[in-house]
Amino acid sequence: MANAASGMAVHDDCKLKFMELKTKRTHRFIIYKIEELQKQVIVEKIGEPGQTHEDLAASLPADECRYAIFDFDFVSSEGVPRSRIFFVAWSPDTARVRSKMIYASSKDRFKRELDGIQVELQATDPTEMDLDVFKSRAN
C-alpha cells in the first residue's frame, strides 16, 4: 500500500520481521531502507538477539537515512527487567536533502504499519544513540 504523501509502499517482509522481533524476540534490531526506484520500504539488515545498541549504531550508514527498530532490554529503577521497542529515525546531517525529505514524509505512515512501537528516537549522529539515551527514553 503506497503512502499518499510520499508514494512509498511497505514491503510485507518489513511487517513480518517486526512481528518476529516483537513476539518471538528472534531479532535485536531491524534496519529498514527506502528503495527510491521501487518506491518501497524494505528490510536492509537484521540484528541477532545477542547484539547491542552499539551494533545497531555501527550498522547505520554515516551519510544515508534509515529507519530502525531496536528491542531494548533494561532494568527499571525498581529493579524489574523490562523491554521497550524503539523506532529510530536515523537522519545524519551528511545525508542528501532529498533523502531526508523522503524519510521524513514517509515516517508516520511507516510507523503505523508496525503495531507495537513504544518509543521514538530521532538521531543524527551515533552519540544520540548511546546507552544513556536509550535508558532515559525507556523509563
From Swiss-Prot:
Annotated positions of the Phosphoserine modification: S6
GO cellular component: actin cytoskeleton; chloroplast; cytosol; mitochondrion; plasma membrane; plasmodesma; plastid
UniProt keywords, alphabetically: Actin-binding, Cytoplasm, Cytoskeleton, Phosphoprotein
Boundaries of every ADF-H domain copy: 5-139
A GO BP annotation: actin filament depolymerization
Annotated localization: Cytoplasm, Cytoskeleton
InterPro entries: ADF-H, ADF-H/Gelsolin-like_dom_sf, ADF/Cofilin
GO molecular function, one term: actin binding
Gene3D superfamilies linked to this entry: Severin
Pfam families noted in UniProt: Cofilin_ADF
Keyword Phosphoprotein: yes
Induction trigger: By the root-knot nematode Meloidogyne incognita.
Major place of residence: cytoplasm
Keyword Phosphoprotein: yes
SMART domains: ADF (SM00102)
Purpose of the protein: Actin-depolymerizing protein. Severs actin filaments (F-actin) and binds to actin monomers.
Family note: Belongs to the actin-binding proteins ADF family.
Protein name: Actin-depolymerizing factor 3
Organism: Arabidopsis thaliana
